[in-house]
Structure formats: structure tokens, C-alpha cells
């Protein structure tokens, strides 16, 4: 179980979502942190802080061959919980479960890029936000689902902090599928660089481009196909 100190830390860092770099009054673990109804996929996208009750599902996702190929964390439950506990205790990172309607489907880490090791590789602004992501449920995969919920996530991040002008990702450089889908949403590849554990590509999206070109299509309108591909 989480220690009392870790529970306190976890409750406090949730407020980084709403108050930027400052901490505010705590919220209950398990509460919906942010949500957005996405007309493009006609589903409600919501976020909750991960907790111990999510561990079995998280382990199943990490042991999915499609996820393991890029995350390389097909570990035991004990080791997975150690990893998540470290993320929960990190005041600059929010480890989250993403939901489509009532279905938990994704693990997401939203973090302050200027406080992350990524800042050693690009000129990070103080309010740049970074994302790590995986989709664990096969039924929630596919390009239209991705366009919808990723647009909602980007919108929620920008709305949480008006000073955030950029969102960045650093996927493995050979993750062509993810980079193609992110490019559709305005996240352009800037350059490649080396982390100790991978060759990475820096993807970057901006607030201005997102609201001028992306959100009106994938965040505010119904999909023209009328179905999920």
C-alpha cells in the first residue's frame, strides 16, 4: 500500500494540473482530474491519477507485445508498482489513467519538460509540458480514436495552464506509427537525439497551431466517417 507520505505527495501533485508550477489544496485520489467530451469520436475523455487498484491492468498493458516493443517494461507487479510509486512521488510528473467514457484504456505521464532529463536536449521553456503515452486496450486503438482522445488531452493540458505554449514528446525514433499520427495533430518532428536507453525523436506542438488548425477538426466536430477506424 502507499505510505502516508506518498499518499500526501500524490494528492498534492494532482494540483499541478490546475495550478501550473505551484501546488494548491489537495484532491482525493481516484477523482476525475480533467475531462472533455470529444464530438469527433462522440466519447468522453477523462483522466484520473493512477493508484494501486490499477496495478493489475497496468501490468497487463505493459506485457502486451505491442506496448512492450517500445516501453520495454514487461516486469513483475512488484517492480511495476515501484516504478509507479516513484512517479507518484515525483512533484513534476502526473501518472494518469485515461478513460474513454467508462473504459480505462491508456497510461499517460504528463510532466514539466523543463524539470525533466529531456531539457538537456532542447531549449525548454518553463511551462513546456511533456507526454509519455501508451494505449493498452485494443478496442480503443485506431486512428480515429487516437485523433479524438489525443486532441482532448492536448486541449486539457493547454487549458490547465495558460502559460503553456508547447507540448513535447520524445518517442523512440523508429516508432513510425506514433510519429505519423502525432504529425496529423500538429506535432512536428524537430530532430533526433540519444537517451542512454533509446534513440529518440523530439516532437513538438504549439498552442497557436493547435487551436487554429487542429482542435476545430478533431476536438469540436463529429468525425465525417461516422464510425471508428
Predicted feature locations:
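Conserved GNAT acetyl-CoA-binding A-motif
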Residues: 159-171
Amino acid at each position: 500500500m502507499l505510505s502516508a507520505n506518498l499518499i500526501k505527495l500524490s494528492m498534492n501533485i494532482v494540483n499541478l494540473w490546475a495550478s501550473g508550477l505551484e501546488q494548491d489544496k489537495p484532491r482525493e485520489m481516484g477523482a476525475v482530474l480533467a475531462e472533455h467530451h470529444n464530438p469527433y469520436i462522440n466519447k468522453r475523455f477523462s483522466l484520473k491519477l493512477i493508484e494501486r487498484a490499477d496495478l493489475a491492468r497496468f501490468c497487463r498493458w505493459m506485457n502486451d507485445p505491442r506496448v512492450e516493443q517500445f516501453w520495454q517494461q514487461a516486469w513483475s507487479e512488484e517492480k511495476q508498482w515501484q516504478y509507479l510509486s516513484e512517479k507518484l512521488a515525483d512533484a513534476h510528473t502526473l501518472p494518469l489513467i485515461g478513460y474513454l467514457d467508462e473504459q480505462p484504456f491508456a497510461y499517460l505521464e504528463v510532466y514539466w519538460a523543463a524539470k525533466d532529463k529531456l531539457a538537456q536536449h532542447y531549449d525548454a521553456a518553463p511551462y513546456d509540458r511533456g507526454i509519455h503515452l501508451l494505449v493498452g486496450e485494443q478496442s480503443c486503438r485506431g486512428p480515429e480514436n487516437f485523433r479524438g482522445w489525443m486532441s482532448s488531452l492536448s486541449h486539457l493540458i493547454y487549458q490547465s495552464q495558460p502559460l503553456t505554449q508547447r507540448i513535447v514528446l520524445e518517442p523512440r525514433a523508429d516508432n513510425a506509427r506514433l510519429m505519423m499520427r502525432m504529425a496529423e495533430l500538429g506535432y512536428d518532428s524537430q530532430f533526433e537525439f540519444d537517451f542512454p536507453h533509446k534513440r529518440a525523436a523530439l516532437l513538438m506542438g504549439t498552442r497557436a497551431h493547435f487551436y487554429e488548425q487542429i482542435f476545430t477538426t478533431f476536438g469540436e466536430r463529429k468525425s465525417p466517417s461516422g464510425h471508428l477506424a
